Every structure is written in C-alpha cells, then in structure tokens.
UniProtKB/Swiss-Prot annotation:
InterPro entries: Nudix_hydrolase, NUDIX_hydrolase-like_dom_sf, NUDIX_hydrolase_CS, NUDIX_hydrolase_dom, RppH
The entry's keywords: Hydrolase
Family listed: Belongs to the Nudix hydrolase family. RppH subfamily.
Motif segment (Nudix box): 38-59
Molecular function via GO: mRNA 5'-diphosphatase activity
Record-level GO BP terms: mRNA catabolic process
Protein name: RNA pyrophosphohydrolase
Any one GO cellular component localisation term in the record: cytoplasm
Function: Accelerates the degradation of transcripts by removing pyrophosphate from the 5'-end of triphosphorylated RNA, leading to a more labile monophosphorylated state that can stimulate subsequent ribonuclease cleavage.
Domain (Nudix hydrolase): residue spans on this chain: 6-149
CDD domains xref list: NUDIX_Ap4A_hydrolase_plant_like (cd03671)
Pfam families: NUDIX (PF00293)
Gene that encodes it: rppH
C-alpha cells in the first residue's frame, strides 16, 4: 500500500529495558543495524501492524511488552535513488512511519529473531538510548533523531520511576553531544521534573 505521495505506511518499534537501553537489531547477512520496522497491510491499523511485526521480527507477544507511547506524527524518509524500483507502479519513494515505544516486561530470552522462514534480522544487542541516532544508515538518521528526542521526553521526564538509574546519564549524554544538542532535556530540566 503506497499513498498518493509515494510513501509506504510503516511502523517502527523501539523496545527498551529497565536500564534505559534499546534493542538494536542486525539485518540478515549484513553489517547493518536498525530498529525493527515493517509495512502496514490493507485493513490493518498501525497498532495491529506493530504487534504483528513485533512477533515476526523479534519473536515477542503483546504480553511480553508494555506500550509506553506512540509518536504524535507520521515521520517520513526518502529512499536513496539506488534503492528505488523505477519499474514498479506505483513507485515507492520512501516510508512514512508511526513509531511505538515499548518496554520489555518479560525475560529477554523470549527474544527470537528466527520466527519466520525469511527473518529480517540475525542478531541483536542492547545499546545506549542515543546510540542508534549516530549509527543508523544516513537516510534514516533524521527520523531516528526526531523519534528518540520525542521518546526521551517520555522516558526521562514524565515517567520518573521507569529508569531511575539511567535518567541523568542519558540526559547528560544528549546535552553534551553538540551534534544533537537541539533539546531542552538538560540536567536542570531533569531536577526540575523531580521537584528539586
């Protein structure tokens, strides 16, 4: 399903643990890492697509996670010209994505990248919250920056009990990195949110 502007509706999934780390997945046979994502089928809601992709790509069921937040807007990225399929009609020029923030509430042993005959990923690891913004393929980087900034406002400001150990470290890291310093989540904001 491709919209009138040439974008394919898609969901992206950020899974975090109680340490404030996020699940980073390795694409099969490549040295390329990303968050799980996938297309939305006809007659399927974004949330339904997210749970389907969660099982197909990561092997998790709805009971294994807690839905914390959904991005407010669709975020778009264009595919590089080398990846465009000019012979397909309609032609897809990129993805428009609704992003979901999940917290793993079951044992990480339930994570299984091999649940389908054609798995997307062949490995995974936990990484620091901001790591994916710098490491993802360049044409997805702007979307990742926007997603993680929006999700940080939920994890590190509104929910003080979720990641108490990692809150200040994550905020200081984000604030110190000049390349991604367009944020208000400073140490002062952190203490203000705690009433100090």
């Amino acid at each position: 399903m491709i919209d009138f502007d040439g974008y394919r509706p898609n969901v992206g999934i950020v899974i975090c643990n109680r340490k404030g780390q996020v699940l980073w997945a390795k694409r099969c046979g490549q040295n390329s890492w990303q968050f799980p994502q996938g297309g939305i089928n006809d007659n399927e809601s974004a949330e339904q697509a997210m749970y389907r992709e969660l099982h197909e790509e990561v092997g998790l069921q709805p009971k294994d996670v807690r839905l914390l937040y959904v991005s407010k807007h669709w975020l778009r990225y264009k595919l590089p010209k080398r990846l465009l399929r000019y012979d397909s009609k309609p032609m897809c020029i990129g993805q428009k994505q609704r992003w979901f923030l999940l917290q793993l509430v079951s044992d990480e042993k339930n994570i299984n990248m091999q649940t389908t005959k054609s798995p997307e990923f062949d490995g995974w690891r936990w990484v620091s919250f901001w790591y994916p913004v710098r490491q993802v393929v360049s044409f997805k980087r702007d979307v990742y920056r926007k997603v993680m900034k929006e999700f940080a406002s939920i994890l590190f400001t509104d929910n003080p009990l979720i990641f108490s150990a990692s809150r200040e470290a994550s905020l200081q890291h984000y604030s110190a990195n000049k390349k991604y310093s367009q944020t208000k989540y400073t140490k002062r904001h952190f203490y203000k949110s705690r009433g100090q």
